[in-house]
């Protein structure tokens, strides 16, 4: 169910109900990344994000946020229309910027769904989350003036200041079954990854195992992934981390609703 009416910077529609969420798209597909890659899942993609990665694969949830305000009941009805689905993935954008995401997750859990939340790890919420799929954004994600899709570098400083919150990351790791999924652009990212993991481990009570850490090649098309997948796979083997594909890109390239 694609929805694409402009929501103008993600300000709430004055007519939207109190439990409404801005939804960019809602669809049934295969989980493409992480520990649950290949699992049939319903994806709920919220619109709006507190960061601006230059390589964002959901441009119309961040740089130009679009969507329609749907109530939790409306979202649940759409999820239940996919009768074979047992897994639901709440993604974005950054879904946890919306307080109503917690209510939606709790409802989904009450109905027996396994819930995964795809988050950049800058916000903690107390909710029914079965798997916190945390993707901390590295320095290589920062939209410098040379890489900014908008061409002006306006978000560079704000993104850089906000992209890592070690306290939020440690709370997520301590509260939920989690995976730490890093988007890797090259070998230079590994030093930052190792340093960040040390910082989280120094605060979190939960031990982070090496197989909780996943390296994923940056790329939103098959051609872009082809340029990096071998290097990232070799880095995963070299450091003892997991390699995760982007299965949906391999299967459907950059088609929406996949």
Positions of PLM-derived features:
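Conserved Radical SAM active-site core
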Residues: 8-9, 16-17, 21-24, 40-41, ...
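Residue-level detector of flexible, active-site-proximal loop/helix-junction positions
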Residues: 30, 60, 250
